[in-house]
Every structure is written in structure tokens, then in C-alpha cells.
Amino acid sequence: MAALSCLLDSVRRDIKKVDRELRQLRCIDEISSRCLCDLYMHPYCCCDLHPYPYCLCYSKRSRSCGLCDLYYPCCLCDYKLYCLRPSLRSLERLRRTTNRILASSCCSSNILGSVNVCGFEPDQVKVRVKDGKVCVSAERENRYDCLGSKKYSYMNICKEFSLPPCVDEKDVTYSYGLGSCVKIESPCYPCTSPCNPCNPCSPCSPCAPCACGPCGPCGPCGPCGPCDPCNPCYPCGSRFSCRKMIL
């Protein structure tokens, strides 16, 4: 548990660091207005206003974008965003790793699963529970203008996993949380196998006879030897043995 806590703290620090860099890029994007490179590059761009990971202009743009360099030197499709791509990929990996660790840790054992739906709005995400399986799907439509015409592209994901045998379909809930992550939860803690009720205590059985068998009756005591007529003996069974009285 100590190693798991250290790993989670390290992951959280890395996520906070990358989030700070992303907030700085958002501030730069708010300063600049609509990107003018969509005239030439928009067939390859998935967004209209350049939010951080969805702009793909840098993947197809030429060595120097004349419109951006002339009017918007702070455009997000410049060399800075190109260099930030590894950080963005690293952030997504960290988020996926964190979700898996949290889903498998003991403190969140009521979480049946989590699906990363980054890039989709909450109303675009659908969760369906049927036949002991959970299906999470999301779909969106991208529309952009290219040389006076409109073009459309579609993006969708679909994830499916099975429910544990002890979870009822009616008890499954889901929530759209931070980090664009859909969490599938159950009110009770899932277990790997159905819990067995405690066995009632069996009534006490009568004491069994000794293994050596019932005790045999005591053999009859041997009769006392005939007493000396001159010396009467003590009655049989006394603590003193028969003896002669010497006068």
C-alpha cells in the first residue's frame, strides 16, 4: 500500500504540472481570436477555435504559416504546440494509468470500471446495461468550412465489459467525472464469488463413549484370609491391613 500511495502521489504531481502548461496555452488561445490558417489547413483540423489537443493543423501545415505569422504570432499551431505533443500524450497515459489504479485499489472497490471519453460532451455519451454487460459509447460530429464548402467528420468510441456475477443490472450507476472519465459503479462492493452465509452451529452431540470401550465392572475383591483365631482382624475395607496383635 505504501508503494501504491507513492505512485499515486507521483502521478498526481505529473498531472498537475501538465495541467498548468495546458492552462497557459488556453490563456494564449483566449488572447488570439479565430485562427486564420483554417483557409488552407482546416480539412485536417478537428476544431474551430483550437482548444488544446484537438487541433491537428500542425500535422499538415507547411514549414511556415504565412497567415498565422503575419496576423496571429500566438497561434496554437506554431512550433510550441508541436513540441508539446509528447507532453499531451504523456498526460493521457498518466490519466489512463491513474484510472486503472484507482479502479483496482481497495479505496474505490465499488467502481466496476472507468472509460476515458476525452473529446466528448456529457450529452454525447451513452451507457447501456444489458445481458450482464455494460456498453459505453460516444459519438460526435465535426463540421468545418473549406473553401466555401462544408465538410463533416465523425468520431466515435465504444467500450464494453462484463459485470461481476454478484452485481445486479438494476443497481449499476454511472457518472461523468473529472478528466472526462465515465465511472461505472455499484452500490455494494463487487466480489469475485457470491458470499456464503455463515453455517449455523450444529447442536452438540451426546458425548461419545471412550475409545477404549465402556468401563468393565470392578472385579470382586478377594476374600480376606482366615484370621488367626487368637487375633481378630479389622473389618474388610478399612485402611489398615489385617495384622496380628502382639500381646
Curated annotation (Swiss-Prot):
Pfam families xrefs: HSP20
Organism of derivation: Mus musculus (Mouse)
UniProt remark on domains: The C-terminal contains many C-X-P repeats.
GO cellular component: centrosome; cytoplasm; manchette; outer dense fiber; sperm flagellum
Name used for this protein in its record: Outer dense fiber protein 1
Subunit structure: Interacts (via leucine zipper motif) with TCP11. Interacts with SPAG4. Interacts with KLC3. Interacts with CCDC42.
GO biological process assignments: cell differentiation; spermatogenesis
Modified residues annotated as Phosphoserine in this record: S5, S10, S64, S87, S108, S109, S137, S153, S175, S180
Repeat positions for Sequence: 34-38, 74-78
Predominant subcellular localization, coarse grouping: other
Function: Component of the outer dense fibers (ODF) of spermatozoa. ODF are filamentous structures located on the outside of the axoneme in the midpiece and principal piece of the mammalian sperm tail and may help to maintain the passive elastic structures and elastic recoil of the sperm tail.
Region of interest: 2 X 5 AA repeats of [RC]-C-L-C-D: 34-78
